[in-house]
């Protein structure tokens, strides 16, 4: 079904857009929305990115896996959420994570042809999209240059933060301690001791093959 155009003004891609500009867009561009149930897949890893997918309401689980599938990070993300807009253009136009509805979600989908039309018609839309993609690119470009700390606890924290889509909120790292030890260049015992020190500080919860972080911004 078609989305209420006036509600778009509250969403990141349309912030700052005047009502007259929105009225012109409404006549030329078709923007559809759907209501999804809990568990519905909104985008899958390696699926072609052929549209901008914007979650207007609800909560989403984003799962990102290593190339060898030896570890996975699951993030709880809140609306409004634009799902990997940087992948609609460029060399690799495929999603690198799987996004699943954790609650009832209202999802807006703008097909690539309509995205190009919006960019042509509206400078506000064009600047908003460019700013979102540029901010994401700048955040990613700094990750490889963070200094590797000798402290194992800080290494674990950096490992998790560098692999998250959003730098705050609830996260899960699903892996074995032996894998984490291999990735960080230390022993399994050192990893185990460091994790339990972080758990004693109530910064995370250690379970079998799962490390839960209630609030990443506190790490």
Label every PLM stretch briefly.
Residues 1-38, 82-83, 87-90:
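Cyclic nucleotide-binding regulatory module and flanking cytosolic helices
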Residues 29, 73-131:
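Cyclic-nucleotide recognition modules
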Residues 37-38, 56-57, 78, 103:
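A cytosolic small-molecule/anion-sensing beta-strand core signal
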Residues 41-47:
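Short phosphate-coordinating micro-motif centered on Lys-Gly-acidic
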Residues 50-63, 79-80:
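Glycine- and acidic-residue-biased ligand/ion/polar-headgroup-sensing regions
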Residues 63-69:
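Cytochrome P450 core scaffold surrounding the K-helix E-X-X-R motif
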Residues 161-219:
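Phosphate-/nucleic-acid-contacting segments
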């Amino acid at each position: 079904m078609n989305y209420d155009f006036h509600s778009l003004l509250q969403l990141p891609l349309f912030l700052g857009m005047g009502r007259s500009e929105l009225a012109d867009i409404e006549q030329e561009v078709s923007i559809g929305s759907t209501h999804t149930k809990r568990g519905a897949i909104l985008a899958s890893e390696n699926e072609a990115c052929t549209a901008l997918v914007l979650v207007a309401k609800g909560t989403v689980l984003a799962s990102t896996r290593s190339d060898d599938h030896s570890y996975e990070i699951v993030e709880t993300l809140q609306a409004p959420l634009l799902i990997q807009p940087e992948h609609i253009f460029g060399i690799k136009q495929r999603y690198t994570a799987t996004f699943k509805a954790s609650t009832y979600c209202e999802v807006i989908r703008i097909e690539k042809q309509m995205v190009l039309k919006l960019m042509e018609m509206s400078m506000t839309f064009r600047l908003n999209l460019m700013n979102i993609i540029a901010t994401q690119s700048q955040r990613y470009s700094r990750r490889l240059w963070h200094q590797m700390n000798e402290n194992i606890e800080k290494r674990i924290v950096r490992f998790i933060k560098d692999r998250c889509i959003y730098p705050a909120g609830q996260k899960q790292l699903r892996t074995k301690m032996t894998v984490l030890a291999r990735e960080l260049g230390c022993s399994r015992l050192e990893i185990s001791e460091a994790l339990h020190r972080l758990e004693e500080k109530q910064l995370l919860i250690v379970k079998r093959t799962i490390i839960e972080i209630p609030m990443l911004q506190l790490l």
